[in-house]
Amino acid sequence: MSDTATDSPAADDAVPATTPADLEAASARVDALRTEIERHRDEYYGADASTLSDAEYDALVHELEALEEAHPTLRSQDSPTQTVGGRAETTLFAPVTHAERMLSLDNVFSEEELAEWAAKVERDAGSGRVRYLSELKIDGLAINLRYEHGVLVTAATRGDGVVGEDVTQNVLTMGTVPERLMGSGHPPLVEVRGEIFFPVAEFDELNARQLEVGERVFANPRNAAAGSLRQKEEGKSPARLELMRARIRRLRMLVHGIGAWPVRELASDAHVSAQSEVYGLLAGWGLPISTHFRVFDDISEVTEFVRRHGAHRAEVEHQIDGIVVKVDDLGLHEELGATSRAPRWATAYKYPPEEVNTTLLDIVVSVGRTGRATPFAVMEKVEVAGSEVRQATLHNQQVVKAKGVLIGDTVVLRKAGDVIPEVLGPVVELRDGTEREFVMPTLCPECQTPLRPAKEGDIDLRCPNARSCPAQVRGRVEHVASRGALDIEGLGEVAAAALTQPLEPEDPPLETEAGLFELTMADLVPITVVVRDAETGMVKVDEKTGEAKRVTPFRRRRAPKRDGVFDPAAPWGDEDSVPSKSAEVLLENLDKAKTQDLWRILVALSIRHVGPVAARALAGWFGSLDAIRSASREELAAVDGVGGIIADALLDWFEVDWHREIVDRWRKAGVVMEVPGHPGPGAAAAAGGVLAGLTVVATGSLEGYTREGALEAIMAAGGKAGSSVSKKTHYVAAGPGAGSKLGKAEALGVRIIDAAEFRLLVEQGPDAIALPDADPAADADPAAGADPAADAAGAPAVGEAGEDASAEVKPKRARKRKAPAAADVASAADVDADAAAVPEPGEPGPGGAAETP
């Protein structure tokens, strides 16, 4: 998946023919687009896979940008158009806040676009020659190494650019990342950015080993890198633990920049003024840098570099999907600046994906969690862009028709973005008359229910048997366990299939997700399941036997022996009643999941339109599932971040009897469905809490508060948590990492407070932080004549992005002003992304803002 590039041809073609004028319709489309984009981001960054091509992803993002531009009130800080990478929401690894935000890169797709980018850079840079550093764009996993006084403190994934996952132990296991930097005079704090990858030459050997021991194989080296690094040691048998460590030890890293870096505190001999000199400094510290970078005086030389490596891209030790071009002069980095998601002084040239021919053997239809029936191309195995491909999505019957492919055709296949397999079309000249047309089935292939559009005019066909369709139940069980929901380790695709579609016993342990928390060891141990492909649902075949691949995921298997001696060629045996470690881990993690946050429970219920943002808003305002269930449409819609569409979806969901059964059985099994200590729906505001009628914006890192914690503290005190600063804002609580909201507050004369004052404010009210000789009420209230449109937008103004996430914040006191009427209480949708910024200041480092995706 490429990062969004608004000037790409794919994005331009994707501008919708019409933009909904009706705000309600626009809101529905925006919500659907955000859900779709976040789902594919989660697939790419979280599950290390994706079902969408670069062009399709860019088209979705561009349509969302157009709608937000046409309807500014729909834009929010957590929109995919304002954020970087994937969401850092997991309980598998501890969260780590980066000292400086890890940005992404904009893309160019042709030599002409590269020349246009360079021309703009040179215009903006003014007089003087611009030199360009060019390097290979590694297709791996972005990593941030934090060194303090030369000692590695943490290693974290990028996450959402602000908060990543702590993978320090696994990075140290690699054995190639120095725990202590070489030399002397190291700064008190420096962040080193790089990419972790799996060597291409060792990839086939890895997958062969995975097959030998019954583990899943990886689709490509990038997935191998992410899948190896992002795993924990707990709960693994000694054999699996050694296998995990062996995979990690094969990983390699190359560094390509610096994040937070207090330049003034460096020794004089470490001073650098160019990106290329940064690489010399990093190499001197003992960090691995790429040897494939060059500095050029002219963009035409960069173009030659791009062509040369494009022709020899398969000869490098790691996969590449383009060339990164950076302005070499660090002084120009600061002058050119950055947008909210990418630096202006760097770009990524994306190579056109590799194309090959293969045979289209069949088109099969898969049914997903929401009942959507999706045709998939099943092809003769072929290698493309470094990995073997057997299948690719065809999206719907209209796409099949538009591509003009017939079963039996020779088709052109490419890796979109060098990651996603995509069928381009048939090689008509090779047809011999044996080909046949694909006919979309009229019945669900899983439960034989007639397929139909969800509503008139829909292209997609869906299975309406939501309760009992095995594929939909399997998908919902997987969703319950996903990182964005209850984050249950051990409940992946194989376990979900085992619980819902077992070969043995005849009756599945789960008919719906209602019984998930009632599972016992007796339910798990007898299960035998046929392994299915995660996307198509097709049965996987054992390449050695030619038969369907069967596993017993929840009971132990006897090692293959002949005459009492281990023999890998002998058949594996089963011990009928001995639970496996996987069974123990699953039951243990299901028990832990019962006490997850209420918002995660809401997401896990698969209620249409209810994602993490809306779920947080509902949980924060109502405090319990019962309160949400009994609320009226007006009460639901009044919650900021919810609105009429989500309110209707909630009411519709609770109207269904088997939905209510899920809630009732989960509760009976011990699932906690309320926020501990919550005073009830809007109780703090209704009771005239200490912040009743006041709007508070939190930005930067506030000591003692997480991002959600600051929001909840404001709401619990009866206040409104704003996402942007306007004349209706009463206080701005600013900590390290605060961005443009701080400047806007100063310009508007809004009172700025620090973390200590914020704590007093939410606990005791405005009187506790009143200025000397000031009227506390006047101190808290902004002037009349506020701009309602600005406040209603609930989003940063255009041009507000690009703030320095590691700048030192010095709270200032502003003049006192008078108050407007009390504002509505806000929700999690209003949370400022800045609130998750750094706990510790540091000046922006050379080359550190750009992070290859």
UniProtKB/Swiss-Prot annotation:
Query: EC number(s)?
Result: 6.5.1.2
Listed GO CC annotations: cytosol
Needed co-factor(s): Mg(2+); Mn(2+)
Which residues are in the BRCT domain?
Answer: 686-775
In which residues is Zn(2+) bound?
A: C444, C447, C463, C469
**Low complexity bias spans:** 1-22, 772-800, 820-840
Identify which residues the record assigns to the active site. K137 (n6-amp-lysine intermediate)
> Which Pfam family is one of those matched by this entry?
BRCT
Q: Which SUPFAM superfamilies does the annotation name?
A: BRCT domain, DNA ligase/mRNA capping enzyme, catalytic domain, Nucleic acid-binding proteins, RuvA domain 2-like
> InterPro entries in the record, alphabetically?
BRCT_dom, BRCT_dom_sf, DisA/LigA_HHH, DNA_ligase, DNA_ligase_AS, DNAligase_adenylation, DNAligase_N, NA-bd_OB-fold
State whether keyword Membrane applies.
Answer: no
Positions bound to NAD(+): D54, A55, E56, Y57, D58, S104, L105, E135, R158, E195, K326, K350
**Reactions listed under catalytic activity:** NAD(+) + (deoxyribonucleotide)n-3'-hydroxyl + 5'-phospho-(deoxyribonucleotide)m = (deoxyribonucleotide)n+m + AMP + beta-nicotinamide D-nucleotide
Which keywords does this Swiss-Prot/TrEMBL entry list? DNA damage, DNA repair, DNA replication, Ligase, Magnesium, Manganese, Metal-binding, NAD, Zinc
Q: Under which main EC class is this enzyme filed?
A: ligase
Q: Which GO terms describe its biological process?
A: DNA repair; DNA replication
Any GO MF annotation of the entry: DNA ligase (NAD+) activity
Show the segment(s) annotated as Disordered: 1-24, 772-853
State what this protein does. DNA ligase that catalyzes the formation of phosphodiester linkages between 5'-phosphoryl and 3'-hydroxyl groups in double-stranded DNA using NAD as a coenzyme and as the energy source for the reaction. It is essential for DNA replication and repair of damaged DNA.
Would you identify the family this protein belongs to, as annotated? Belongs to the NAD-dependent DNA ligase family. LigA subfamily.
The name this protein carries in UniProt is DNA ligase
- Source species of the chain: Clavibacter michiganensis subsp. michiganensis (strain NCPPB 382)
| Gene name in the database record | ligA
